[in-house]
Amino acid sequence: MDQTYVKALESYEYLFGLADLSDFDSRMKFQKTTYLLKVLGIDFSGLKFTWFRRGPYCFDLVGVKYKPKPAHSVLRADEIIKIDQNKPLIHELMDKPRDAELYSSIAFLQREEKLSPEQIIHRMGLVKPWFEQRDVEAGIHKMKQILPAN
């Protein structure tokens, strides 16, 4: 079994407690949190995120809740420290599913597709019209302050 999927679930549960991934919003929050943790430097080698309707999505994370887990932690000490350092930020950004979608989508478009702020605003207006332009602009500003440089 690949430990990367287990690490994603363990990281999520370290942040938010026991994962209940039985509904759409909780699964979306898990996906978006895992992507943000990857961007912040947690080693999720092997997890490939693609653009999906609600932002970054990894097909390999589907059903991870039901895969067997090892008896020991797969998170390294340095990764736990990194998660602890970013815990308040992650909770702020990922608390609500709508926010998780907004911030992770902006991060994906900045980092993976290398879009400029103007291009992100345009793309989000096309594919996610439920977000107002001012929300996208504020999200871009916030993500610029917290994301590590490419």
Q: Could you tell me what each predicted segment is?
A:
Residues 1-150:
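Domain-edge interaction signal
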